[in-house]
Amino acid sequence: MHFKDKRVLTIKTTDDMLKILESKGNPLKDFKKGTKITVYNKMEQGYSYVLAENPGENMGEDFKPYYTPAEMLALGCFEGKYFNQNLLEFPKEWFINAIKKGKLSPQGANPECNYFKVKSRLTLQEWKDYGWVPDDDGKINKKHPILSDPNKNPDAGGIAIWFFRHWMGRRIPELDEIQIKRWKAYARHAGQIKANCKPGDLTCRPRQRQSLLQWFYKADI
């Protein structure tokens, strides 16, 4: 299996992505319990993990995400920009399908790639300021000591990259418990939509619906 290619650091177009995927992409069937994955992108280099479960299996009794990572990418999330340098870390089918659907935009964040065609996320720097991901200077956030600690949270890209890796089969019990609690708390946004929108009216609260998709909750409620 291939996990490192310097071309991922200079991706400009979906054609660049397809060339890498065609020559070095890893199919889903090759990922299984015991597979060691090496991460290589601009944000994360030198990190690796071993799958403790087969992809999509035994994610936790109280963790039942509505979407799979493949479905999230195909529907459109994070302006088509977020996961593009992780194309060798995850199954190539995910990216090829999303490219075919016009949902990836390596040349720059594009809200039109989102399912609801609106921007619905904070910046990475804001995530760092809140303590949801490790900061560049290694400062520990008192409110979120585990999430902000680079020695305990290897996911520089936040809860979505945590979910992709968790779905694949990585397990970090302490971190997993925290992220699943955050995910469960996010259900309040679904409650707000149900309280303020007619069922199936996708024009009502599109930003909040997009955020639900990006937190792996059913968005077309």
Q: Language-model features: where?
A:
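Long, compositionally biased low-complexity regions that are usually intrinsically disordered
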Residues: 2-4, 17
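Low-complexity, intrinsically disordered activation/interaction regions
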Residues: 154-221
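Compositionally biased, intrinsically disordered low-complexity regions enriched for acidic
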Residues: 10-154, 170, 188-207
